[in-house]
């Protein structure tokens, strides 16, 4: 009985080992099948990728011999996309145009408010803004200090930092330019000269042909030089102011012209040989006084100093012809 038991036990162990081996073999077969399936799927993926690359190569070959571009490829421009781009560009241009029109209108309004508004000379944008800044600053200074708008300091504040043409325009519109200042100085000097100049007399004898230099008035005018106003006052102040012009002797005939030289002929008078004091009058540049008698030889230059020792020798009328012959024969 014991042997039989032992045999049955061994049989059970053998059966168990065979079933275990069968299970192990089946599990190995399943593992192999699972490994084979993803391999087949991977082969299919690689085949599709190779097919796509081949198609891309064919497209590049069709494009021609163009150089290959690196980076992302551009999208193809379709009609809808072109229309969208065009609409965006039109909107941007219209927006920029309206902005510039508004800016120009605002600057024009600002130019009209400025003290030097001119229709002919239009200020630039930067000059308009600088002038507006200076104008605001100058007005604030006027309110604080109480100075007038026509002073020199106001103009200096307006012209600070501006270009030369803009400064000239501001000064010209405010009538404080360099020309007006020069005119003011000239008026001051002329008033001083009129107050200091008194009567100036010198010997004038008979109106016959004077001695050399041949009676040519231009030769005397070449040596005339303008004199300072202080020296004029010193030279003219010593003469008596109660002298008067001589009485009118007779009508003068038109000047006789001989080859460019002018001489005056006067009708006969019993006082031809008489010497008398001749006194020229000086008229101011502003013509404030009335018109007085002046010498027939007037030049465009103002106020020349006539030499005091300028004297004329008297000649008889019968010697005039011989004198002229000797002059022009030389």
Swiss-Prot record:
The keyword Metal-binding does not apply. Residues 23-80 are annotated as: Disordered. One of its GO terms (cellular component) is nucleus. Keywords: Activator, Developmental protein, Differentiation, DNA-binding, Neurogenesis, Nucleus, Phosphoprotein, Transcription, Transcription regulation. GO terms for molecular function: DNA binding; protein dimerization activity. It comes from the Eukaryota. InterPro entries: bHLH_dom (IPR011598), bHLH_transcription_factors (IPR050359), HLH_DNA-bd_sf (IPR036638), NeuroD_DUF (IPR022575), TF_bHLH_NeuroD (IPR016637). Serine or threonine phosphorylation within the basic region may regulate neurogenic activity. Residues 52-64 have a biased composition (Acidic residues). SMART domains: HLH. Residues 67-79 have a biased composition (Basic residues). It is found in: Nucleus. Expressed in retinal interneurons amacrine cells (at protein level). Expressed in neurons of ventricular zone of the retina at postnatal day 1 (P1). Expressed transiently in amacrine and horizontal cells of the inner nuclear layer (INL) of the retina at P7 until P14. Residues 87-139 form the bHLH domain. One of its GO terms (biological process) is oligodendrocyte differentiation. Efficient DNA binding requires dimerization with another bHLH protein. Probably acts as a transcriptional activator. Mediates neuronal differentiation. Required for the regulation of amacrine cell fate specification in the retina. This is Neurogenic differentiation factor 4. It comes from Mus musculus (Mouse). The lineage of its organism: Eukaryota, Metazoa, Chordata, Craniata, Vertebrata.
């Amino acid at each position: 009985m014991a042997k039989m038991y032992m045999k049955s036990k061994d049989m059970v162990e053998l059966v168990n080992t065979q079933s275990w081996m069968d299970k192990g073999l089946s599990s190995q077969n399943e593992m192999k099948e699972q490994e084979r399936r993803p391999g087949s799927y991977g082969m299919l993926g690689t085949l599709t990728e190779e097919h796509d690359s081949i198609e891309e190569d064919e497209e590049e070959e069709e494009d021609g011999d163009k150089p290959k571009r690196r980076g992302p490829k551009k999208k193809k421009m379709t009609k809808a996309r072109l229309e969208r781009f065009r609409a965006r560009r039109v909107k941007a241009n219209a927006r920029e145009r309206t902005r510039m029109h508004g800016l120009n209108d605002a600057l024009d309004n600002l130019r009209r408010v400025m003290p030097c508004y001119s229709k002919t000379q239009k200020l630039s944008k930067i000059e308009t803004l600088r002038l507006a800044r200076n104008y605001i600053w100058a007005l604030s200074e006027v309110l604080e200090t109480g100075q007038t708008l026509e002073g020199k300091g106001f103009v200096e504040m307006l012209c600070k930092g501006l270009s030369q043409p803009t400064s000239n325009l501001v000064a010209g519109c405010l009538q404080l330019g360099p020309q007006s200042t020069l005119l003011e100085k000239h008026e001051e000097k002329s008033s001083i000269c009129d107050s200091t100049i008194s009567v100036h007399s010198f010997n004038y004898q008979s109106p016959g042909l004077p001695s050399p230099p041949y009676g040519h008035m231009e030769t005397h005018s070449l040596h005339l030089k303008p004199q300072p106003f202080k020296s004029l006052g010193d030279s003219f102040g010593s003469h008596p102011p109660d002298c008067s012009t001589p009485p009118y002797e007779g009508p003068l005939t038109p000047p006789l012209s001989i080859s460019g030289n002018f001489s005056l002929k006067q009708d006969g008078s019993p006082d031809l040989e008489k010497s008398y004091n001749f006194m020229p009058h000086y008229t101011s540049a502003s013509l404030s006084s009335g018109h007085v008698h002046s010498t027939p030889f007037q030049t465009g230059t103002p106020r020349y100093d006539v030499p005091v020792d300028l004297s004329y020798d008297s000649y008889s009328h019968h010697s005039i012809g011989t004198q002229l012959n000797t002059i022009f024969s030389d």
